[in-house]
Amino acid sequence: MSRIQRCFKSLASAGFFRTVEDNKLELLSHGREYAKLLQQHWTRLRPLAAHLGATKEPINPVNIQRFSFPQSQQFRNNFQKLVKDHPRKAKCPTLLKHQSTCSGPTSNSLFGIKGPTLHLTTDFLVEPHRALEHFYNMQRESKIWWMRLSSNPSRYRIVPCDLAEDLNPNDYQAIDIRTSYGDAGEVTVEQLSLVRIVDDKDFRLPDARTGEIVQPTVIRSVIELETTTCALLLDGCDHGRDSQSLLLHRVLAPYQCGIACVESDSELSADLSDLCQHLKHVLNHAGLRLSEGDGIRTTKNASHLAEHLLETDMLGIPYTLVINEQTLRNGLMQLRSRDTRLAETIHISDVPDYLLNIFKN
């Protein structure tokens, strides 16, 4: 069994995705939660954008509309919505964000996705004389964004796309941002396309600096949510370490923290249970996402605890609070890290501020 095949099996057993007909992937409960967090993270990217919401009508696959999208009715409707609903942002340069369902997912060499899929689209309307400058800047920003989400940033690269002979490179440009899994194949996580629009009286904006009316050039970014979710999950699993763990970005991990209670003295079990419930309330109130179920796992000994921590590692949970009878006496507990598999001692009064600072940084 190859390394990537082991990752597929591990992610399926952990409840992130499964293989269905025609070797296509379907997200399971943990995978859907990860996709939801990734979608929210994308929404916060480039916060000055005008958010136009979701398009109800399904669209054709993105590869068909790579350069023809400015002629689509959806694009026209979005532009009119910008001018009407966001007049202060209707200047060049500006950003539009919208989401749409696609009935036909794009294919890649590593896996397919069971449709339909959600497209996260950003349209950057820029001054024509600075279009290439903006295009290169957007490439760099997007690649950095993906690298920050990755457990192995070096696997991401920018791949220029060949243009048809009838397309002028001054008017059309396209690149893919791809993540590589060695000999197993590559996955495109984002497509960037530049289209220069000429002589369209219905598509004009004032230049934000000069006030001159210009014909914007459009740079479009398209992210296929389900495909990129599976790619990032594979990224977190395919790390080459000896340990079986899922190295998800702390911000995107479906569960950020767990509570493990080592209960070796039955006489103190009620007090330990009360303490666990208190910690659970504190962490929930702070907005941290606890592990599945009630977030608390009771263990009897060190061996049982080690088995539980292996399970949390495979779920990608970054931190686990380990409490025992000693915690009742002096307030000290262990904060165990998924990435290092080491634990540090913290005081109960440090919860949740210490954890919140970790996730903010």
UniProtKB/Swiss-Prot annotation:
CDD domains: Pol_gamma_b_Cterm
Organism: Drosophila melanogaster (Fruit fly)
Keyword annotations: DNA replication, Mitochondrion, Transit peptide
Tissue and organ distribution: Expressed in ovaries (at protein level).
InterPro entries: aa-tRNA-synth_II/BPL/LPL, Anticodon-bd, Anticodon-bd_dom_sf, Gly-tRNA_synthase/POLG2, POLG2_C
Quaternary context: Component of the DNA polymerase gamma complex consisting of two subunits: the catalytic subunit DNApol-gamma/DNApolG1 and the accessory subunit PolG2/DNApol-gamma35.
Subcellular location: Mitochondrion
Protein name (Swiss-Prot/TrEMBL): DNA polymerase subunit gamma-2, mitochondrial
Function: As accessory component of the DNA polymerase gamma complex is involved in the replication of mitochondrial DNA. Does not bind DNA. Essential for mitochondrial DNA maintenance and larval development.
Disulfide bonds, paired cysteine numbers: none
Main location: mitochondrion
GO molecular function, one term: DNA/RNA hybrid binding
One of the GO BP terms on file: mitochondrial genome maintenance
A GO CC annotation given for this chain: cytoplasm
Coiled-coil blocks: none
Transit peptide: 1-18
